[in-house]
Design a protein with these regions (language model features):
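Short connector loops at helix/strand junctions that flank enzyme active sites
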Residues: 40-42, 62-66, 72-74, 112, ...
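A short, N-terminal "cap"/entry segment at the start of jelly-roll beta-barrel domains
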Residues: 1-47, 57-62
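Conserved metal-binding segment of the jelly-roll/cupin
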Residues: 110-129
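Conserved short histidine dyad/triad with adjacent acidic residue
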Residues: 45-63, 73-87
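Short alpha-helix capping/helix-loop boundary micro-motifs
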Residues: 65, 101-106
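A short hydrophobic beta-strand segment most commonly corresponding to one strand
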Residues: 69, 116-118, 134-146
Length: 146
């Protein structure tokens, strides 16, 4: 997992193929309407908006074919993280959606507007949650094939 200011994410371009195109797309979207925006090579950017949910009892997710870059545009969210190898897969891994749901023990951090985090296939992550008080957020989720 990588956590950094969005403006510094370019430092990781060598290990994140497709990053440059995604950053340009996010910068070009004037209204950032919640939707899915396709990129080349099966990559995409999802603009999401909502209110965080309680982390209590929530399941994490992990992917096998994509990594996520979650960039908080407005507000904040807390994210839970744990190595996927330490988690328990709940049900079947959904190959079509490239998503498995996991339970286990997580470490949490709050991500503020202007910051992003990168989660790789080995990172179980619980995005869009809160520990105490719900918070509104708007974010760009960049999905890059690995």
């Amino acid at each position: 997992m990588i956590v950094c200011p969005w403006k510094e994410l370019h430092r990781y371009a060598a290990i994140l193929p497709g990053l440059e195109e995604a950053v340009k797309l996010v910068a070009s979207l004037e209204d950032l309407t919640p939707a899915t925006y396709p990129l080349s090579d099966g990559n995409k950017v999802l603009i999401q908006q909502g209110t965080t949910k309680s982390a209590n009892g929530a399941l994490a997710e992990a992917h096998r074919e994509y990594l996520d870059i979650q960039y908080i545009l407005e507000g904040q969210e807390t994210v839970g993280w744990a190595p996927v190898e330490t988690l328990t897969l709940e049900g079947e891994f959904d190959i079509a959606k490239d998503k498995g749901k996991y339970s286990g023990h997580f470490d949490f951090m709050t991500i503020q507007a202007g910051y992003c985090y990168v989660v790789f296939p080995e990172d179980g992550h619980m995005p869009g949650v809160h520990l105490d008080t719900p918070a509104d957020f708007k974010k760009a989720v960049v999905k890059l094939k690995v």
